[in-house]
């Protein structure tokens, strides 16, 4: 299948023809041709936009086209997002680790306090016994 290119004059006649004024066409044919005309205009716009995006140079013949700029910018953004994600993950890990450390210290502190309270027992006379040694024995 081969495609042939038409002159711009052929395209402009298709675009500018007013099918509503043509007496040889039925109203349905007029509407169908107007819809084809509208679709043709939209396809031309899409084609022009795609051509701008896929150009390897800008309008002045220098530098890179907009699609290449977009791809490069997206790559840079992706790299930055990876760094941000890594730093965020590290910060969250650090916070969780600090919370675990604090909870562990509190647990150890409570255990030591309980051990001290268990080791210091008072007898009936109010004397404090330290690890089995009473104050009276001194």
From Swiss-Prot:
Write down the superkingdom of origin.
Answer: Eukaryota
Which positions, given as ranges, span the membrane?
A: none
Q: Return the annotated region ranges for Disordered.
A: 1-20, 106-138
How does it associate, per the subunit comment?
Component of the DASH complex consisting of ASK1, DAD1, DAD2, DAD3, DAD4, DAM1, DUO1, HSK3, SPC19 and SPC34, with a stoichiometry of one copy of each subunit per complex. Multiple DASH complexes oligomerize to form a ring that encircles spindle microtubules and organizes the rod-like NDC80 complexes of the outer kinetochore. DASH complex oligomerization strengthens microtubule attachments. On cytoplasmic microtubules, DASH complexes appear to form patches instead of rings.
Q: Which keywords describe this protein according to UniProt?
A: Cell cycle, Cell division, Centromere, Chromosome, Chromosome partition, Coiled coil, Cytoplasm, Cytoskeleton, Kinetochore, Microtubule, Mitosis, Nucleus
Q: Which residues form a coiled coil?
A: 30-59
Q: Which GO terms describe its cellular component?
A: cytoplasm; DASH complex; microtubule; mitotic spindle
Q: Which GO terms describe its biological process?
A: attachment of spindle microtubules to kinetochore; cell division; filamentous growth; mitotic sister chromatid biorientation; mitotic spindle organization; protein transport along microtubule to mitotic spindle pole body
Q: What is this protein called?
A: DASH complex subunit DAD3
What protein family is recorded?
Belongs to the DASH complex DAD3 family.
User: Can you say where in the cell this protein is located?
Assistant: Nucleus; Cytoplasm, Cytoskeleton, Spindle; Chromosome, Centromere, Kinetochore
Q: What does this protein do?
A: Component of the DASH complex that connects microtubules with kinetochores and couples microtubule depolymerisation to chromosome movement; it is involved in retrieving kinetochores to the spindle poles before their re-orientation on the spindle in early mitosis and allows microtubule depolymerization to pull chromosomes apart and resist detachment during anaphase.
Q: Which InterPro entries match?
A: DASH_Dad3
Q: Which PANTHER family match?
A: DASH COMPLEX SUBUNIT DAD3
Compositionally biased residues, Acidic residues: 112-126
In what ranges is there compositional bias, type Basic and acidic residues? 1-11
